[in-house]
């Protein structure tokens, strides 16, 4: 049986995944994880930051934040996504974060899967129609603050007090223009501090532990069975790390959803079947999880589950394409 990747190549189609969320919310982490698992040759990605219509100086003069739709070329982005879906290359604008200025354009050609990440990928109906699978990343204020300070100070040359001031300035526009987009997402990824803080080490670096809640729209199409193997003997050993997994049904902005919450760190053996299913489905032997560590944190598991959802969505879209041809 042909793998999903082989079938996508043969179909000649281009599929677009959108990842929405605030600046510093972890969108790129999710995007890189999906790209690594699906394969570098199968996926290309870009940031909506490249579609700013105002540079940093102009935004300051106009007293407008990048989160305001008027500070972005949303129609141009829609034009480009529609062109990419047709297999056409584009001249994509480039935004230089180090200078806060536009830096011309660069050629950008589609791969079989295109990931667009940014503040407003679901803001207009035209954009939503151009995106096949929509993910919204929604960390808590404390997690987002930590990640944004770490990124903007370490990678973009800001001072910590500048980042904190910007976070406060942006909050109203985030609520008005970005947060609202999660009602259109098929998957919402909520990231919070772990509840296992009391058991974390008192000295040395703190483990990268989080609590991740995956809010997923109930799939209409049938999905492939996948097991999470739980070995009770491992759980009862004193060396076993703490973790929790829970699932519930709920309504989310008028949609029926399933909510899976993962916290702590999970042993690699528990995700072996999920990894095997992904490898078989994708037709790849690429590294799925980080084998340097015996345990996978909640974000790593969320990336696996997200990618499994992506493959199921691709299966559905490929099948629908055959039915309509």
Residue ranges, per PLM feature:
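C-terminal accessory "lid"/substrate-recognition subdomains
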Residues: 7, 151-325
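Receiver (REC) domain switch/active-site residues of two-component response regulators
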Residues: 49, 132, 186
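Conserved lysine of the Walker
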Residues: 27
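Conserved beta-strand scaffold positions in the cores of enzyme catalytic domains, especially
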Residues: 43-45, 134-136, 188, 259
